[in-house]
Amino acid sequence: MDTAIIEVALPLAVPGTFHYRVPPELQAQVAVGREVVVPFGRRRLSGSIVAVGSELPADLAASIRDVLEITPGEPLFSGVHLTFFRWLSSYYLTSLGDVIRTALPGGTRSVTRRLARLTEAGARALTEKAASGEEGEVLALLRDDPGLGLARIRRRFPDRDVRRICDRLRRQGLILWEDGLRGPQAAPRRLRVVRALVPPGREVAELKPREREILDQLAAGPRLLRDLEGQVKNLAYWIRKLVAHRLVQVASEEVYRDPAGPPIIEAGSAPRLTPEQEGAVRAVSEALRDGVFSSFLLHGVTGSGKTEVYLAATAVALDLGRQTLVLVPEIALTARLEALFRQRFQSRVAILHSGLGRGERRDEWMRIRRGEAPVVLGARSAIFAPLERLGLIVVDEEHDASYKEERGLRYHARDAAVMRAKLTGAVVLMGSATPALSSFQNALQGKFRLLQLPHRIDQRPLPGVAVIDMRQQKSGTVISPPLRHALADTLAAG
């Protein structure tokens, strides 16, 4: 395949993509999903590769320009996700570049910064000693270290008005400002990891007690060096001895930042389902095994056990080698479901929402991208999760208006979930005690299959509701006497 020409999506409010030529020295790095820096008019912009080996339109052959940079590292999305991104672009009338910018979490994207570079005139001025003083010093710095940002130049000359000097040099044509990639906003976290080179159970002769203690600690798997420091006295000395005898290895490795921490509850078994829950799970399971697109609306009263249906369906998807995406309308609602899903599926669960730090978002995205977390739980933006083998999408509280994004790419996560499931042959399961009218109508018309849980677990009654006519209370009263007495009783009961 000819990889000399690529298509790039740029985050601009213009339709279409742009063709660029890849220089020979960069062609080995080309892949869909990689970030690139390209010239665009007089600017340098960062975008994403969306096609490789494209046929160049005849009218562009003479004017095509070269790619300037390609970011190292893994691609951030694949062709599977690109199909979904293109649909979003077409349906919501947003450029493909803007869709991709919205989809990729902040911690994964590279950022551009303004870099100062010498022009040919600037290089001549230095050679001919036409520039002197503070201007000459800045030019000499840029000659020795090309491509510096304003902050880096300020650090070298803290007592100078660097911005004024650079503006003067730019007006004289001695330097120019360009956009360059600075790398991801959040870099991988690397820590020192110790791993045993001796197979578990194999006896090693002439070990000191401390050495045997360390090997026993490593029998279950690699450990962070910092975690062992508080458990073994004089650890550094004993580690050096074990390394010298080739019994352990110490290396700097990428370690994920975990937004939730290790599960504090042991993995639990699934409770026994009610007949109504069993019927719902059976229907979803059959669709999962068929491996074709299906959509379900789970209408269940509050307390009827919809969450347990989600958990059981997720277990079926995992058994089939497929992945599950669970959407909730708001970040605040993720905590409850997160505890339940992590209890059932432990470290296989990843969390995605804007409340995470950039580093956490980057690490969770990469865990999902690498297939290490087959269950993803998150708010609206988790619909973009880079799942390659998506089998089930759960949309909890599908009626909630928070699924609608009101800025930028104005997508509705529930509607996007239905289309993503359709594009990937997955099953979408939407649940609510009060379904949206549009969803319920779709179910009545047969577009969605209606599943119902009309009864609460153990036939528990719904909480009583009393309507108080506040017109009968004194003017200015906010809390009625019955509510005040109920609050007092609740506080007294602890």
Language model: regions and residue ranges:
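Short amphipathic
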Residues: 464-471
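Conserved interdomain hinge at the start of the Helicase C-terminal
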Residues: 474-494
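Accessory, non-ATPase domains that flank or precede helicase/AAA+ motor cores in DNA-metabolism machines
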Residues: 1-432, 439, 444-460, 492-493
